[in-house]
Amino acid sequence: MKIEINENFCKGCDICIVVCPRGVFEKSKKLNKKGIYPPIPVNPEKCTKCNLCILQCPDQAISIELSQE
């Protein structure tokens, strides 16, 4: 599974960090080109694919790609 944040869409609202029940995301410690600290998936192995982050993201910046096993 691969969790991606599209930094072109993300505005750094941190909703994904707040709504994730498993603590998958943290705020990056580095500014991106837009001058924000985007969320990063630091614990992707904890993701249960509940899609709360995707559903709550106002900018549709999050995608989860399921690996074909």
Swiss-Prot record:
What sequence ranges are listed for the domain 4Fe-4S ferredoxin-type?
A: 2-30, 38-67
Recorded hits in Pfam families, A to Z, give: Fer4_7
Keyword ATP-binding set for record:
no
Annotated InterPro entries: 4Fe4S_Fe-S-bd, 4Fe4S_Fe_S_CS
Keywords, A to Z, come to: 4Fe-4S, Electron transport, Iron, Iron-sulfur, Metal-binding, Repeat, Transport
| Cofactor(s) of this protein | [4Fe-4S] cluster
Which positions bind [4Fe-4S] cluster 2? C47, C50, C53, C57
Q: Which residues bind [4Fe-4S] cluster 1?
A: C10, C13, C16, C20
What does the record note about the cofactor?
Answer: Binds 2 [4Fe-4S] clusters.
A GO molecular function annotation here is: 4 iron, 4 sulfur cluster binding
Q: Does the keyword Transport apply?
A: yes
Q: Which domain of life is it from?
A: Archaea
Protein's recorded name: Uncharacterized ferredoxin MJ0146
- Organism in which the protein naturally occurs: Methanocaldococcus jannaschii (strain ATCC 43067 / DSM 2661 / JAL-1 / JCM 10045 / NBRC 100440) (Methanococcus jannaschii)
